[in-house]
Curated annotation (Swiss-Prot):
It comes from Arabidopsis thaliana. Ca(2+) 1 binds at residues 415, 417, 419, 421, 426. Residues 365-395 are annotated as: Autoinhibitory domain. GO terms for cellular component: membrane. There are 3 contiguous domains conserved in the CDPK subfamily: a kinase domain, an autoinhibitory (junction) domain and a calmodulin-like domain. The autoinhibitory domain (365-395) inactivates kinase activity under calcium-free conditions. The keyword Endoplasmic reticulum does not apply. This is Calcium-dependent protein kinase 15. GO terms for molecular function: ATP binding; calcium ion binding; protein serine kinase activity; protein serine/threonine kinase activity. Residues 13-31 have a biased composition (Polar residues). Ca(2+) 3 binds at residues 487, 489, 491, 498. PANTHER family: SERINE/THREONINE-PROTEIN KINASE. ATP binds at residues 108-116, 131. It is an enzyme of class 2 (transferase). Ca(2+) 4 binds at residues 522, 524, 526, 528, 533.
């Protein structure tokens, strides 16, 4: 059973009675799983070791590293296909010849839209994975939108330890290329099978990583929509390798008040409210609950020979805690499974609450603080000169709603009293929810850095300014608009007077600050800032966090 997706409106009875068109190839059984991890027969027999069985030896076919499981959309009416001219761009930036930047290596896997390879960066020798998507296969506007959104979300979530890092997105005349961190380890279930046995404590460690991904996504305003074991890879072959979420092809930004109706996901892991076509971020919690159930007993809780049968079982919602090995599983573990698989999404536990559950907290929680994406961005912002901060504020004011969906949700999550500003306490609590362990002094430093106008709070635009820069600097049009804002007379230069005028408008225009900016940015020492100097300033200090810790992969 691969991913399924539907863009037409069906009733719950349509889905249960089997009138929804299947996206599964006719040469495969309806409940085919993309991995042979789960092939339960009636009665289901565990295909992975459970917490009470220690010697299982399964011969598994080798799994391509970083293989993306491609989604397929199901439509009742055929749409007129899009035909691309070779001169047309999808990503909105100039074509780049990928082979000038990277040397492509062996094929790792292939999906509906393209092929994933290993690749080596020519300038550094670092090794990555390259997912090449053929543009001629993107025959519908929805396909194009999905690819663009996947790139945007991966860039937005960049910097999280449990999420695969994207290096860059490139486009040539034939393909779009996503270059990302190469996970050299196996799939989650492959590691468990190879070990032969594991404990509840080990299962708690795994689900902690999964829930951490969910919590970060939700706090940052993203719904994953396709959580399953196949979409988690180990960063390396090391015993204590980090688990990484790899596929965001079905992910969307959370829109306040929106009810989602698309049927997406993978059959075993799909929440009942998805089948009812009315859902929100809680579907990710359900999927995490299914993963935990499988970790503890070896089979999914809702099983059938067919996809229609699986959906029937999900709607019924009867969970077996009586069969082996459940009598020997702790009550605390079963309690967490029940809370994650609560049928009513409004009553379902959140990721943050699940991470506080005694069964998870009772385990060996990692001592190492997580340097979250938000925190790393704010640290970079703190180190910037005043002109750069001001330029980012100008850019933030010009961004569209589409471009800042996730950040808007994150601001709302931090602004707990809904005042429209973030106080010191709200910033401290918000960063703590993202896993950061900062001292009072460090939080105060970040607060002072983000509070551009110095009024003691961070307003919406200041927050966007301090957090959006990490993944927006390849957008030349934003940088050019910011330059034009300062260059009032359109001379092609920012003069001392123009700089003073703009900085005073934002309460930053003391003489020392202006001289400091000119001295730092004006590299040709002519007393003014040209566009090239401005661009160099905007792009300085932008690095790919975490990359050096795991690359190159040998």
């Amino acid at each position: 059973m691969g991913c399924f997706s539907s863009k037409h409106r069906n009733t719950e009875s349509d889905i249960i009675n089997g009138s929804v068109q299947s996206s599964i190839p006719t040469n495969q059984p309806e409940n085919h799983v993309s991995r042979d991890v789960l092939k339960p027969q009636k009665p289901p027999s565990p295909q992975i070791p459970t917490t009470t069985q220690s010697n299982h030896h399964h011969q598994q076919e080798s799994k391509p590293v970083n293989q993306q499981i491609e989604k397929k959309h199901v439509l009742t009416q055929p749409l007129k296909p899009i035909v691309f001219r070779e001169t047309e761009t999808i990503l909105g930036k100039p074509f780049e010849e990928i082979r000038k930047l990277y040397t492509l290596g062996k094929e790792l896997g292939r999906g509906q839209f393209g092929i994933t390879y290993t690749c080596k960066e020519n300038s550094t020798g670092n090794t990555y994975a390259c997912k090449s998507i053929l543009k001629r296969k993107l025959t519908r506007k929805q396909d194009i939108d999905d690819v663009k959104r996947e790139i945007q979300i991966m860039q937005y979530l960049s910097g999280q330890e449990n999420i695969v890092e994207i290096k860059g997105a490139y486009e040539d005349r034939q393909s779009i290329h996503l270059v990302m961190e190469l996970c050299g380890g196996s799939e989650l279930f492959d590691r468990i099978i190879a070990q032969g046995h594991y404990s509840e404590k080990a299962a708690a460690g795994v689900i902690r990583s999964v829930l951490n991904v969910v919590q970060i996504c939700h706090f940052m305003g993203v719904i994953h929509r396709d959580l399953k074991p196949e979409n988690f890879l180990l960063a390396s072959t090391d015993e204590n390798a980090m688990l990484k979420a790899t596929d965001f092809g079905l992910s969307v930004f959370i829109e306040e008040g929106k009810v989602y109706r698309d049927i997406v996901g993978s059959a075993y892991y799909v929440a009942p409210e998805v089948l009812r076509r009315s859902y929100g971020k809680e579907i990710d919690i359900w999927s995490a609950g299914i993963i935990l159930y499988i970790l503890l007993c070896g089979v999914p809780p809702f099983w059938s020979e067919t996809e229609k049968g699986i959906f029937n079982e999900i709607i019924k919602g009867e969970i077996d805690f009586d069969s082996q090995p459940w009598p020997s599983i702790s009550e605390s573990a079963k309690d967490l499974v029940r809370k994650l698989l609560t049928k009513d999404p409004k009553q379902r536990i959140s990721a943050a609450q699940a991470l506080e559950h005694p069964w998870i907290r009772g385990g060996e929680a990692p001592d190492k603080p997580i340097d979250s994406a938000v925190l790393s961005r704010m640290k970079q912002f703190r180190a910037m000169n005043k002109l750069k901060k001001l330029a980012l504020k100008v850019i933030a004011e010009s961004l569209s709603e589409e471009e800042i969906k996730g950040l808007k949700t994150m601001f709302a999550n931090m602004d707990t009293d809904k005042s429209g500003t973030i106080t010191y306490e709200e910033l401290k609590n918000g960063l703590a929810k993202l896993g950061s362990k900062l001292t009072e002094a460090e939080v105060k430093q970040l607060m002072e850095a983000a509070d551009v106008d110095g009024n003691g709070t961070i307003d919406y635009i200041e927050f966007i300014s301090a957090t959006m820069h990490r993944y927006r600097f390849d957008r030349d049009e934003h940088v050019f608009k910011a330059f034009q804002y300062f260059d009032k007379d359109n001379s092609g230069f920012i003069t001392m007077d123009e700089l003073e005028s703009a900085m005073k408008e934002y309460g930053m225009g003391d003489e020392a600050s202006i001289k400091e900016v000119i001295a730092e940015v004006d590299t040709d020492n002519d007393g003014r800032i040209n566009y090239e100097e401005f661009c160099a300033m905007m792009r300085s200090g932008i690095t790919l966090p975490q990359q050096g810790k795991i690359l190159p992969v040998q």
